[in-house]
Amino acid sequence: MNKKHSSPAQKKISQQVVFQRRINASKNIEQASNVCFSVLAKSMRKDSFTEFLYMFRNFLDLPVAKNIMNYRYKGDTIDIFNIKTMPFEMLEIRDVVKWLTEIFGYFSEDLNDFVKAKVAITNNILLADFEGAKRNLEKFIDDHGVCNWTIATELSLLYFQGKITEYKDKIKEFTHIEDGLSQSFLTYEGIRCNPSVTSERYRFSIGKMIEEVRIDNQPQLEETIKYRHDFSPCDVYSNMDFIFSNTCEKRIFDMYNSFKRFIFYKYNDGSDISEIVTCVEKLTNSIHDSEIEIFYKRISGTESDIKDEQYNEVIDNYINNNYERVITQSEKILLEKPYFSVIYLPYIKSLVRKKQNTSLPGPIGEIIRLSCNLFSNIEFEDSLKKLSKIYYVLLHNDWVHIIGCILDNFDGSDGINNPKRYNYVDSLLLINNKLSFRDSTNFKWLDDENISAWRRDKIKADKYFYDGEYGKALNLYSNSLDKSEKNYIEELKAKIIYCHFSLGEISVAITILSELLSKGANPRTLPINTVAEYVAKEGHYKTNNDELYNEAIILNAYNKNIIAKYIQHTSNVCENFLENIDVTDKNQITFENESIPAFFLTELLSIDVLEGMTSIIESEVDVLLTRLNIDRYIVTNEEKFDSKTVRKSKNEITNIFYKLIVQACSNEAGEGRIYVDKSSLKAKLINDVERELEILRGSDNKELNTYVELTDDHGIEYHTMSTPFMRDVFDLMMKVSDGYTIDKLYGIDQSLNVGIRHGGIVNLLWAPLKNNGIAALKSKDSKFIPNPVWRNDFGYYNKGFLDSIDKNLVLLNEKLNTIINDAKEKVHINTGEFIESAKVFNYAIEIEFVEEMAGSIDKIDGDTFIELIFNYLDEKTNDCLDYAKNNFIPKLRHEMIDAIQNTRNEIKIENINRAISQSKIQLEESIEFLQSWFNWSGTSKTPFALKAAIEKSRLILSKLHPWLEINFSGSLNTQKIFLGKHFTPIVTLLTLIFENVVKHGANRDSTEIIVDINENNDVIELSFVNKVQEPFNQDELEKFSRINEILDTEYETYSARETGSGIFKIKKILSLELKCKNHVHIHPTENSFGITIGIYDNGGMFE
């Protein structure tokens, strides 16, 4: 007997009975929801989608379903992702969309409320009606509950209001969420809107999370993180269907937002979405959302009741250069719809052309003002930082990607991805954008003669550019250069560069880009990213120096303005350039060499770049002396250079002078190379610190509140200051900390830079291989190649055997090169932009110390404030040095020795193995020496006589002035022996004295210094006199007299900024570094210059 099939009505009753029984047996709404969706999930797994959807509709028809659906998809708690999702992996994406459409239809009334509230609240926030935004948001939450959108909107509202206390309270709630995904997601939402976290820091936090999943080899999670926390229409999500379906089920309003973002992205990406057209149409019948209605009209091609009249009117006026009318219309529209971002750019560019300020209020006014600043190059860096922050604060809104377009214009890409962002926003705000090259195929309206010729040509060229017809675009761009408005010229030149590059005319693109950069163009407005990457990756040995010079200029601009990624590539290009003009020695690198452009010397040959030029620059001292000679020429001939270049060279001379002293003293005064010029820093900071402390002391509210912003995977807490007073105290502390760590002249990073990173780590670790003949050669493309000496010494072996030797030794060189470069990159300061394990020197100020300093503001002066922070950071540095010696160096030793040992095991020739073994022994010694560098400089325990310090100073001067003979008359012997720890400061002050002699000496080829030493029980007095080249006039003598008068009281202030005799620096060394009672007096005559210094024994000077 055949089995009878149930009718649809019978099946509906049967299924509803099952659901009702399960619901009746449940103790509460949570259990009822779980059992009902368990039944639905089972059907989704085993039945066809049609059967599952039929069952779902039958469930929704139950009267009790409303409570269950509200419980599942709406809620008052902030654990917004605490939901056991349906098994969407069983469904095709079209079926997921169909199911979501059913959900949205069921909640249509709620979603209509949501659409209205979203528009109203967005308007309130952007137009600075913050109280209205708060009321509307609270009402919506009261009526419909909490979701990610309400939380993100509240955080953005608090950001624009500047309400830190309320923001703190909101963030505190996240720490108590038990659901892990909800807590993680909302934590990053909090960081995104945190007033004290920059956009760069937010991106870093996202990058850190991505780095962790990348290590675990989970590429799909990597894209999911980007999609959730840093979505961009320009990004490629290789499995968008998976990302969306895997995250689509959540609170109903978030589901709806996520669905819209998904379909807009798919449409914008060019994917086939024909299967979901009917679903979108169904939504338009029940949900009155202009974005969905516009999108449906786009994908269905049907006529629309919605017109783009407002937009078209603005654009018509814009392309006809009627900028005043554009401004008037735009402001009227934006006061009604401030989120109507498709008119931001014509409005902004019209303001720029008319040199007007926006009249719009609140955040929308700030967005426009900052954008105008960027296009006008006014307060550029600050405006870029602030606009980027606003972009991230508003990132939960899809219209915000127009701000992303603006930012893309200034990231070195020339906004190449902008069409994707424009198209994405067009998809939700416009039926048809007449300027969109995706939407419009007919540009007959351009034939209107009222439109200026240059404008018509530019739009046509942009169309060709969009379509990839770069040849046609190039012709039109080039023809428009002389006709366009001034404001468009730079944009046209950027497009011309990209066209040449895309047509394979690489050398032309490089030449044009280099010329623009040389003339001062902003690299961020040009396609420097693309060209610099090509130069770095495809660059090779050349004989054409014009091409090399252009490449070096581009790499230099990229390194300094985008990211310092291609330093070694710049070194290679510069070295190639110099070799082509037969410069093989550092002494040939001079301004007198007419084959070397002045810009090449002033800007390109930085210390970083010189350090990488290993064929010409042989040692760490050569690096410094080469740059020193360049700087000296600039300062001596300052009338030939701009003030910025001269000022930079003066500062660099001071820095190099000290570094040479540190290196020269390393044997006698210990090998330590870590140094902070605290006294100079204090003089530089003291005025600002005193002024800001005075303001802090007058604060009405000195509440010492902080709160935990987030806790990382290792349990480390990140705090944020919760009151204006605490934030201001912390900012002032960070100003001092930044000086200590990263000040370019006096901070600790300078000692890492010149003393270790670019002061010999590479040469030190390579020396053992070079000394024993197992170092490979480098090709002109900087690739390792076999050293011919290997075959010369062992040529009696067969070819296969020798090939094996070549292969293994080249691999060893490559491996060691990677290890050495990785180690070099770790010797950096980390002030928060890296994960802690990535760098050796990590500085983070603990919250307890901030609170301690904040509580002492009324009791301490500026000098004490700075000293307390310096002492705190000294302890941090000691910890870093311990880490370097006990972790970093042992790991480096293990990796290098292991690589050498593995190579030895592969090679069967005894003589080579002996060379490898000898290299291993010497490498151990080199690493031991490197370890000694990670100590404070000038910390030797070996006592010394004054004569030894004088001889060391003479040696340093011979390096600084190799042509000069320095003679001393008088006895250099003393009875008193100085403690070893004072060696470097004593040598420094002697060198300052002798350098002054050289400057004013009577003879250019030789000079004589008359030395007189007097010793008593508790003091040693040193007098140095020399004849001068030119007699001092009366004004100069009065200046010296004035110096004697103020020397004891104002040496700190003047030592930080003087560039003359160095007398104040000498006094500073005696008082602050040696910390001894002293006297300093200068006694010039008409034909001589003398200085006397007295050093008193305070119990810690002499042996």
Swiss-Prot record:
Catalytic activity annotated for this protein?
A: ATP + protein L-histidine = ADP + protein N-phospho-L-histidine
Q: Supply one GO BP term.
A: phosphorelay signal transduction system
> Repeats (TPR): which ranges?
818-851
Q: Residues bearing Phosphohistidine? A: H758
EC category name: transferase
Q: Which domain of life is it from?
A: Bacteria
Which UniProt keywords are listed? Antiviral defense, Phosphoprotein, TPR repeat, Transferase, Two-component regulatory system
What EC identifiers does the entry list? 2.7.13.3
* Record-level Gene Ontology MF annotations: transferase activity
PTM characteristics: Autophosphorylated.
The question of whether Ribosomal protein is a record keyword is answered with no
Q: What does this protein do?
A: Sensor-kinase member of the two-component regulatory system Detocs that confers resistance to bacteriophage. When the system (DtcA-DtcB-DtcC) is expressed in a susceptible E.coli (strain MG1655) it confers resistance to bacteriophages T2, T4, T5, T7, SECphi4, SECphi6 and SECphi27; the level of resistance varies, resistance to T2, T7 and SECphi4 is not very high.
Q: What is this protein called?
A: Detocs histidine-protein kinase DtcA
